[in-house]
Amino acid sequence: MAIQTQLPCDGDGVCMRCQVNPPSEETLTCGTCVTPWHVSCLLPESLASSTGDWECPDCSGVVVPSAAPGTGISGPESSGSVLVTAIRAIQADVTLTEAEKAKKRQRLMSGGGDDGVDDEEKKKLEIFCSICIQLPERPVTTPCGHNFCLKCFEKWAVGQGKLTCMICRSKIPRHVAKNPRINLALVSAIRLANVTKCSGEATAAKVHHIIRNQDRPDKAFTTERAVKTGKANAASGKFFVTIPRDHFGPIPAANDVTRNQGVLVGESWEDRQECRQWGVHFPHVAGIAGQAAVGAQSVALSGGYDDDEDHGEWFLYTGSGGRDLSGNKRVNKIQSSDQAFKNMNEALRLSCKMGYPVRVVRSWKEKRSAYAPAEGVRYDGVYRIEKCWSNVGVQGLHKMCRYLFVRCDNEPAPWTSDEHGDRPRPLPDVPELENATDLFVRKESPSWGFDEAEGRWKWMKSPPVSRMALDTEERKKNKRAKKGNNAMKARLLKEFSCQICRKVLSLPVTTPCAHNFCKACLEAKFAGITQLRDRSNGVRKLRAKKNIMTCPCCTTDLSEFLQNPQVNREMMEIIENFKKSEEEAEVAESSNISEEEGEEESEPPTKKIKMDKNSVGGTSLSA
């Protein structure tokens, strides 16, 4: 028994069986493939399933016997049934939007199959010339919003004289065909796509000289890349403690994986490089270790400023900056400008406000101090900054940032014979405070204080949570990734920004002069301006004059284009993909930060510290 032939309507709405264009009330639309069918040409067996969403004979797989010769209509066990199953699976996928379902159905019906083309392949196919079906070379965008290669467009519009779009058959203005303009925003998008593609291919990668901590020697060493001999270009040796760079306070035994005793007061090292390996003071040149938004963790007394005064249990420390280090100068003793409370100086002031403990190391280079070691670098315990101010330095020309450090450690100082550590003591009298400016004295209770019940110094508030990864290479990797995300965002804002609102394009339209605007911004720019201007004054009747609507970026007349501006859909998809990737990256970054911070967190103040110039504070080192 043969199968009866049943044919749908074509793209123009004409029935392919009776060659009649039926009205809409005489057609049925399939709920699966969305194809119209002429009711009069359908067999009664096909209309029997009209309850709910009607399915056409091709999708339902209904076999109608007939005496006619066999045709190619599929039965329930043929490939047509497989096609219907695939279409139904697409329709049942709740993760897809209607537009994505339509694309998948179209690709399936055209023979491409629902092979699950990955997102990267989709992105590659988003921009293509409608003539050569390749990435546009010097892309040109027509007023109807379709993109072509410059050569293809010239061959189509100028060489063949066709002034209609190949895709939508919209009319192309003669001035656009005669003088096409390259869309620079699409050029940047294509270049960025090519760079991303090349970065994923196997190429000669840049060599990164990475040595893991466990593979480093015990002492600082020089590599083959060192320019100078000695320790001028030396690399750091192995780190013996497991603390992050922004760790506050003493280094406990739990972080000493080698000796299980922590770093004790009075320990000495040969130089700053070895001191760095034990985490007491990480910078091997700078005297202050800290961050302006977090606080200062440690300082080094090494004779850098003549203004420093060392009295053992307390000392006056000078901030950094104000010296000309241009010309690759590492040290300059002459003060050339005022110091300001920013960067490292701001970190010290924040530690003063919050009452954080600051580790102090003294170097043999401090020749004017009786408490400095004879050789090497020595750890002298933790101090607390009680006051900070500005005052003219000993050179008599420029202001210096000054800090009062007072010792508050549970271990005795190296220069004393005491068996116990420090106790709260009165603050010393500092004569230079009489002429000080920008004086700040902590009023609130400090984070590091003395517990009378336990008789020792400890954290009275939760210590600041570390914001740095322990692994140096992991920290560098995160920094590079964040820098790359910022660069991507900056490029997105620059290349795909509206020329009116300066924001990322929303519903982008490309003018005949190849400028890109938000559709709403461009329409609002010329809102209320009619196409023609009536010049009749009641006495004389003149012809209506055309209003010139000049492009906001050039002198091109956009009056004809503004009659029906078309959105550049391909560019809009590119922008949406960029935004989606940015949102995913931000969510991933925020989740990583939340995992590192944990449940308890003590945030430093985010607002700028307000200085109380009239307050001189208490006269004792409070607990």
Curated annotation (Swiss-Prot):
Q: Where is the YDG domain?
A: 258-407
Quick one: where's region Disordered?
A: 580-623
Q: Which SUPFAM superfamilies match?
A: FYVE/PHD zinc finger, PUA domain-like, RING/U-box
Gene3D superfamilies per UniProt: SRA-YDG (2.30.280.10), Zinc/RING finger domain, C3HC4 (zinc finger) (3.30.40.10)
Q: Is Transferase among the key words of this record?
A: yes
Q: Which domain of life is it from?
A: Eukaryota
Positions of the zinc fingers (RING-type)?
129-169, 498-555
List zinc finger spans: PHD-type.
Answer: 12-62
Name the job this protein performs: E3 ubiquitin-protein ligase. Participates in CpG methylation-dependent transcriptional regulation and epigenetic transcriptional silencing. Mediates ubiquitination with the E2 ubiquitin-conjugating enzyme UBC11.
| The protein's name | E3 ubiquitin-protein ligase ORTHRUS 5
Organism the protein comes from: Arabidopsis thaliana
From which lineage does this chain's organism come?
Eukaryota, Viridiplantae, Streptophyta, Embryophyta, Tracheophyta
Tell me the name of the encoding gene: ORTH5
